[in-house]
A protein has these predicted regions:
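Ligand-binding beta-strand-loop-alpha-helix segment within the catalytic cores
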Residues: 1-3, 59-132
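N-terminal glycine-/serine-/threonine-rich phosphate-binding loop
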Residues: 1-35
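Glycine-rich N-terminal segment of FAD-binding domains in flavoprotein oxidoreductases
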Residues: 29-55
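A glycine-rich beta-strand to alpha-helix segment
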Residues: 33, 42, 46, 122-149
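Short beta-strand segments
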Residues: 36-40, 68, 105-106, 133-136, ...
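A glycine- and small-aliphatic-rich helix-loop capping segment at beta-alpha/alpha-beta transitions
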Residues: 48-60, 83-85, 147-156, 217
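Class I SAM-dependent methyltransferase SAM-binding "motif I" and its flanking Rossmann-like core
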Residues: 143-187
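ATP/nucleoside-binding phosphotransfer catalytic cores, i.e., glycine-rich phosphate-binding loops
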Residues: 188, 192-246
């Protein structure tokens, strides 16, 4: 049964502050918590706010652990478009989190299934994800879990759809440079998080957002599985919320 808390905001800065409030509550309650993190432009105001709050003495990341949702296959950690580099430049390098307490899937792993199993074990050893940050793709994908005929459970390799590659080509010089595959947490891993915070902006996401939370639960819209999560907070702007209940 869906337990959805909707917070509507007007600006990216408001979204960052609202999302940071959710993370701050978890970190203050559990200083060694596990954050599930995401990349892209939407989380940037959140990451800026988290950095500012630690600098102001409101937060302490020294015991916090983090596990990222996904990584491109074939990109080295220092590649300009790797998600590891994104996290370093936009969050990790600016807070007190320990390097050994941050994990991102290894896009260069020789044995990807083995790496994926080790990734799951690490999250399990940490006690699971306490708060998971998510966005949503135009086709309803979460992480890189693309529409398909089943809900993938564990961390795994996935072939990226043309729609996803097209959406991400703005970060690369051309579509030919966009990787064709990625490693992503599975739907089961995401659903095991104790709390989920989804951040969404833009009128172009209004239709899929309504499908995710109020349409049929189907692997053809991977995010629709969130209807079965016990604690989801959706933070979105008015444009994205256009089709959500008032």
């Amino acid at each position: 049964m869906l337990h959805l808390n909707i917070i509507k905001v007007k600006t990216p800065e408001e979204m960052g502050k609202a999302a940071a409030d959710e993370f701050e509550a978890v970190i203050c309650r559990k200083p060694a918590c596990v954050m599930g993190l995401a990349t892209g432009s939407t989380p940037l105001p959140l990451y800026r706010e988290l950095i500012a709050r630690e600098q102001a003495g409101k937060l302490d990341f020294s015991r916090v652990r983090s596990a990222n949702l996904d990584e491109y296959k074939g990109l080295a950690p220092d590649h300009p478009q790797s998600y590891r580099r994104f996290m370093q430049e936009n969050l990790f390098d600016h807070i007190s989190i320990k390097p050994e307490n941050t994990i991102v899937p290894d896009g260069l792993a020789d044995d990807i299934p083995s790496m994926c199993r080790a990734y799951e074990r690490k999250i399990e050893d940490w006690g699971g994800v306490d708060i998971q940050l998510l966005g949503i793709g135009h086709d309803g994908h979460i992480g890189f879990n693309e529409p398909c005929d089943h809900f993938p459970v564990m961390t795994h390799e996935v072939k990226l759809t043309d729609m996803t590659r097209e959406a991400n080509k703005r970060f690369f010089t051309s579509i030919n440079e966009v990787p064709t595959a990625a490693i992503t947490m599975g739907i089961g891993t995401v659903m095991a998080a104790k709390k989920i915070v989804m951040i969404i902006t833009g009128a172009d996401k209004a239709e899929i957002l309504h499908k995710v939370f109020f349409g049929p639960v189907t692997p053809e819209v991977p995010g629709s599985i969130l209807q079965f999560h016990h604690d989801v907070t959706l933070i979105c702007d008015e444009a994205a919320a256009a089709r959500m209940p008032q």
